């Protein structure tokens, strides 16, 4: 069994696209982990150029995207702009 790594977490206020957050929360719920744990895993995999999700999880993500109307893709990431308040 892998050795546990002790870390220090900090609270942060991050703004995310509304539908993206719903998908992330839904995915975290299906994995029975916190949103923070999910985000840490995604980022750590990305930092090493590794895919964070397997085929089954990608299917779950596709389903959650449909449920929440999320049509954004990786190509959208550099094009996002907020509506003026």
Go through the PLM ranges and name each one:
Residues 31-58:
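Short, basic amphipathic alpha-helical segments that act as recognition/interaction helices
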Residues 24-25, 47:
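Activation segment
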Residues 16-21, 36-39:
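Extended hydrophobic secondary-structure segments
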Residues 1-18, 25-28, 69-75, 82-85:
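Short Lys/Arg-rich basic patches
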Residues 6-7, 33, 42, 61-67:
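Weak global preference for isoleucine
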